[in-house]
Amino acid sequence: WVRIDVTADGVYALTRSRLRRMGFSNPDQVRLFGYGGYRQNEVIQADTDYDDLQEIPLFKQNDDTWLFWANGLLYWEGNTRVFNPYATKSCYFLTEGGEPATLETMAEVPASSSKFQISTFVDHILYEKDEYAWFSGGRNLYDGTSYASNNTHSYALTTTDSDGDESLTVAFSSGDKKSTAVLTNVNGQDVGTLSLGATSKYVYGTTSSATYSVGAHAQGNKWTIRLTSTAGNEARLDYLALHYRRRINVPSQVGYVAFSAPSYSKPSTFVIGGNPASLRLLRVDAPRCPSVLVSTQPLDGQSVSAVVEDPSARYVAFDVTHSFPEPTYVGEIENQDLHATDSLDMVII
């Protein structure tokens, strides 16, 4: 077993030469296992949760390169981020031998059953640095920059293929004995003020958040967020999240777009911008099958359509001609017999 790591969602490449350097004699027989770095459900359902590493079928880009979708450390439920505070890397594992899983194609859904046409989805731009704790406990960390000495800081965010409907979530924290106010300014316009309570004997830090509609202040794809807190108060940013409606296009810079339409529950048609000759579509959250191909039909020279049974699932459209990054090689993993280990107080897997 060889461990590889990623830190963010994305399409990653495994090349024949890299696999050989990892020690595999026959890269065509290499198999990929894992479920990435998303935080696992805190309530495990025996009927739906898989209790072992799942094999991920690889997409063969060419004779010397295989592609796969990797989950990073964070995902979204609506406009709420769900992050994994227990890991800094998302782990996958490679092995050689046996028959690698085949990347199957989902059964085609008749176009006549499609109820909606979907060409946009809600995307999120997150600014967050977990560098500081108000108390030596808990799992939420805060930005390393203190607002006590300089109570105004600016942050730059950039959207991709925005179709409007922007909103901004500001989450802030304070560790001061006096109450704190935080003014949010977006592209030169004040949009709202947060209020945070004071600390006390048993309260080491307070938090507050708010979401503001900011679409009226758009200036292209560039967003400057300026936060000003009560002068002299000890306070720190938790995170900024810019939510917006994004067109389903495959950008040339990264070569893929990941999307879903959770507000739709009936068969629908996705319209995806990209070169029909080189665009492929994966569903990456099918139960017990982490990756399956979805059939597409060319609409014109710049887009394709795909009729899907469940538009609320997660899909990834990617360009097979793009040069994708490789995961980080960590090393070989020795076999372990955890059942033979004694004197344990607690095990977290």
What are these model-predicted stretches?
Residues 1-6, 17, 22-349:
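Structured catalytic cores of large enzymes
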Residues 12:
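Ligand-binding face of N-terminal immunoglobulin V-set domains in extracellular IgSF glycoproteins
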